[in-house]
Amino acid sequence: MAEEGAAGWGAELGPEGAGSERGPGEGPAGCSRGGAGPGAPEAEAQLQEAVLRKAQGNELYRDRRYRAAIGKYHRALLLLRGLDPEVTAPMRSFVAQRAVLSAQQEALLRSTQVDCYNNLAACLLQRPLVDYARVREYSLRVLRWREGDVKALYRAGVATLQLGDPRTARQYLLQASRGQPHDANVRKYLRLTEERLSSDHEREKALYRGMFG
């Protein structure tokens, strides 16, 4: 199935998370200084390094250097993994002086993760041989933390259709269409999904006719 338009949907808005502003009394990307508990300076530095890597990935994405952008996003996610409470909480009893993020830092961590996974999916859809399983995986990670994200719903739908599950793909694309009812690519892939479901239904009917009669 042709992939025209699947990768570039929303590209006119640029990569996710581009152009963050600083607020009064805040550090880079709006993260407040201090107040995060043991190891806070190291955690702050690691968080800001991840934000920087994501920004570098965004620049590479805009330059169509998708492979290099993927590397930057992966590096950002690796840095964030060491700070993610979902990952580090089970280890707190074994590791002394584990940094505890402030609520604002944790929000920045999560939004940076979401942006990186969204942008990784976009990069993968630009490659000559698309890894649709990975596109779906990344898009579902976005939806876990940012329910209703239209780009993630759309990409999950495209990937799921390509992986041979038009019924589930239709669910994702219908949700995406509620957020972007006039988007040409969403409507295109929703139509392709309906055609695939109709074709599968006709094949099933023909199979049963052959079996019984």
Each predicted region: which residue ranges?
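Boundary/linker segments of alpha-helical solenoid repeat arrays
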Residues: 83-87, 150-151, 179-192, 201-202
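Alpha-helical adaptor scaffolds
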Residues: 79-152
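Intrinsically disordered, low-complexity, charge-biased linker/tail regions
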Residues: 5, 131-137, 194, 199-213
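Structural motif corresponding to the intra-repeat A-B loop/turn of tetratricopeptide repeats
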Residues: 63, 127-129, 163, 197
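TPR-repeat structural position
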Residues: 66-67, 130-132, 166
